[in-house]
Structures are given as C-alpha cells and as structure tokens.
A protein has these predicted regions:
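Structural transition elements
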Residues: 1-6, 24-32
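Detector for C-terminal structural segments
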Residues: 21, 28-38, 43, 53-177
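Short, well-ordered beta-strand elements
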Residues: 12-24, 49, 68-69
Length: 177
C-alpha cells in the first residue's frame, strides 16, 4: 500500500488481469490462479478485473501489448538459458509478435544477455546468465509463479526410461525386463 501511495495511487487502483483460456503443464487452471492473484491484489488496494479471450486472440493481444497484467508461460525446449532469458526478456523480443509480452527492454540486462549468447567459456557464460537473472528479479517486469512437474506413468517391466527435461520421449537404451 505504501508503494502504491508513493507511485501516486493513495486510494489504490484498478487494472485488468488476463487469464489464459487454456490449460498448460505450468498452469493447469489459469482462471483459478487469476482469482487467487485477484484476491491478493485486493489486499493491497488493487482492484483487478479478470478477462480472457479465445486462445489465438489472447496471444495476439498479449503480443501486441494490449494487456495491463496477463499470464503466459514457457517450456524451454533446448536447455540453453538464452532460450528463456533472451527469448522472453530481450529487447528484440519486445517488438510486436515477439515473446517478450511485458515489452521489457532494459539495456543493462540486454548487454549482459547479448554478451552471454556469444561467450564460449562455460564458467564465464554461467556468471553472465546468473547476473542476468539478478537483474531480471530486481527489475521485475514479471514474476514467476510455477514450474511444471513432469510425470509419466511407466510399467514396472520398462527399464532405463528417463524423462527428458525438454518434454521429449527418447527410447534409446530403453528395454523390457
């Protein structure tokens, strides 16, 4: 409430909160998450109206920056930090139709991520991406609320089946007892 008052909203404020109309592994019930967020926001004086659209329309409008607050998620498909940090927070991705729907473009972050992209030394690259994560959390263009847990039922006769962190099913080396 104090920060809202300092920002010029001593009596609170109103906003839209867009809820995804689809289920995703990282957010299986966006409407319920939106309701919980709405309740938390109300406690500090922010009245949030939940809105949703058909999925194609939702994504189009989010990418165009029409939202005030909205939900999206990401499932990294290659394990490289660039696939998250640059794709979702980089300046080039902030353009219309990009994946950076927060339209976040902060040069100190951008410089670190662009440098990390081309550094071949793994230790230096790790340090740069760690620095980028600190900047992301300090600037807070959006916040993370969940991480998907993968569960795959496998019969007890199946041996050496391993879950891929990328959601792929690799059967190399898999066998039956």
């Amino acid at each position: 409430k104090k920060l809202l008052a300092q920002a010029g909203f001593p009596n609170g404020m109103t906003t839209d909160l867009w809820a995804m109309p689809v289920q995703r592994p990282y957010n299986p019930n966006a409407k319920r998450i939106a309701e919980l967020m709405q309740a938390d926001l109300a406690k500090i004086g922010v009245k949030a109206e939940i809105k949703s659209f058909e999925w194609g329309e939702y994504r189009k409008r989010m990418q165009a920056g029409e939202h005030q607050m909205g939900m999206l998620g990401w499932t990294g498909d290659n394990g490289d930090p660039d696939n998250f940090l640059n794709t979702l927070l980089g300046c080039d991705s902030a353009k219309t139709n990009g994946s950076n729907v927060a339209k976040f473009c902060y040069q100190p972050f951008e410089e670190v991520v662009q440098k990390a992209k081309v550094v071949s030394n793994p230790t230096e690259r790790t340090k740069l991406y760690e620095k980028a994560q600190v900047i992301f959390k300090e600037q807070a263009p959006w916040f993370t609320i969940a991480h998907a847990v993968q569960l795959k039922p496998v019969r007890k006769e199946v041996i050496d089946f391993k879950l891929s962190p990328f959601g792929r099913h690799t059967f190399y080396g898999v066998d039956m007892k």
